């Protein structure tokens, strides 16, 4: 549906620009003998999780980052998972890493995430780093919110002074995005809505920018969007036919000024900023 009226916020092209920059920075680190390494911890054989992890390592190869994979069987104990996390925390080759979610039900996700060394938290979702974001202290930033801000800037969508309506209160997007957008460097005004918000269209029609991250198929429709507004589609869910769809309905393209496609919008940037967090930490370690 792109090209009907709205300008496409192209996440793939923007990711490619970031990768060109990262490749140069990784080459400079490698010359100093400090090649960054990204680790992944994958438990079990969920096809979606396997695909995500494969994608992350393929991205690493494109920019010259070393891959460190820890693939574990689905029936491991919490103690065995903890031991793997401790090993990566201590491993000097591993600059940063992620524990791929969801974990099997018998494992404690929050305990696993809290065990990650906050300095090696490539996702930017460790409680310490989310706390630093609240305090406006330097820390690895959550990848999806950072990707959203970068994508808006790349296409010169005005953020300072803008009213942004975020739909979704999850820890990976909705909550931290509000914190990023209200920093002095962004200066947006944020309204945080969710699936239980009453009269949601009243909020969205007032918005300069809408970020849909609720995981409800096509919940944002054309009549909810002010003409010319920017609409970012982060939601991922399946429709009745099992097809992956976003939170933004196709008719929004006819009304909005900018729309991020889904797939091909924010997703590629989430992966790009995962690598950026790792490269930035390698550079900080190199500076001493």
Swiss-Prot record:
GO terms for molecular function: methenyltetrahydrofolate cyclohydrolase activity; methylenetetrahydrofolate dehydrogenase (NADP+) activity. NADP(+) binds at residues 168-170, 195, 236. InterPro entries: Aminoacid_DH-like_N_sf (IPR046346), NAD(P)-bd_dom_sf (IPR036291), THF_DH/CycHdrlase (IPR000672), THF_DH/CycHdrlase_cat_dom (IPR020630), THF_DH/CycHdrlase_NAD-bd_dom (IPR020631). It catalyses: (6R)-5,10-methylene-5,6,7,8-tetrahydrofolate + NADP(+) = (6R)-5,10-methenyltetrahydrofolate + NADPH; (6R)-5,10-methenyltetrahydrofolate + H2O = (6R)-10-formyltetrahydrofolate + H(+). Its EC number is 1.5.1.5, 3.5.4.9. Keywords: Amino-acid biosynthesis, Histidine biosynthesis, Hydrolase, Methionine biosynthesis, Multifunctional enzyme, NADP, One-carbon metabolism, Oxidoreductase, Purine biosynthesis. GO terms for biological process: L-histidine biosynthetic process; methionine biosynthetic process; purine nucleotide biosynthetic process; tetrahydrofolate interconversion. Pathway: One-carbon metabolism; tetrahydrofolate interconversion. GO terms for cellular component: cytosol. Signal peptide: none annotated. It holds the Pfam family THF_DHG_CYH. Catalyzes the oxidation of 5,10-methylenetetrahydrofolate to 5,10-methenyltetrahydrofolate and then the hydrolysis of 5,10-methenyltetrahydrofolate to 10-formyltetrahydrofolate. Homodimer. HAMAP family: THF_DHG_CYH. Belongs to the tetrahydrofolate dehydrogenase/cyclohydrolase family. This is Bifunctional protein FolD. It comes from Mycobacterium sp. (strain KMS). The gene is folD.
């Amino acid at each position: 549906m792109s090209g009907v009226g709205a300008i496409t916020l192209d996440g793939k092209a923007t990711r490619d620009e970031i990768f060109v920059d990262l490749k140069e920075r990784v080459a400079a680190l490698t010359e100093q003998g400090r090649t960054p390494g990204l680790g992944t911890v994958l438990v079990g054989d969920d096809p979606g999780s396997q695909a995500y992890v494969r994608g992350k390592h393929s991205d690493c190869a494109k920019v010259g980052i070393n891959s460190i994979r820890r693939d574990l069987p689905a029936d491991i104990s919490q103690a065995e998972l903890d031991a793997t996390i401790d090993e990566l925390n201590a491993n000097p080759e591993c600059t940063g890493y992620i524990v791929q979610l969801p974990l099997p039900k018998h494992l404690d996700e929050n305990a696993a995430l809290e065990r990650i060394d906050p300095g090696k938290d490539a996702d930017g979702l460790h409680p310490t780093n989310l706390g630093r974001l609240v305090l406006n202290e330097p820390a690895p930033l959550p990848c999806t919110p950072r990707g959203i801000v970068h994508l808006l800037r790349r296409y010169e969508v005005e953020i300072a002074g803008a009213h942004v309506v975020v739909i979704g209160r999850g820890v990976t997007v909705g909550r931290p995005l509000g914190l990023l957008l209200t920093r002095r460097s962004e200066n947006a005004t944020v309204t945080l809505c969710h699936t239980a918000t009453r009269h949601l269209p009243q909020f969205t029609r007032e918005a300069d920018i809408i970020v849909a991250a609720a995981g409800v198929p096509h919940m944002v429709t054309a009549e909810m969007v002010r003409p010319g507004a920017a609409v970012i589609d982060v939601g991922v869910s399946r429709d009745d036919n099992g097809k992956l769809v976003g939170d933004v309905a196709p008719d929004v393209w006819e009304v909005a000024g900018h729309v991020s496609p889904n797939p091909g919008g924010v997703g590629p940037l989430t992966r790009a900023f995962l690598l950026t967090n790792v490269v930035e930490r390698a550079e900080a370690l190199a500076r001493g």
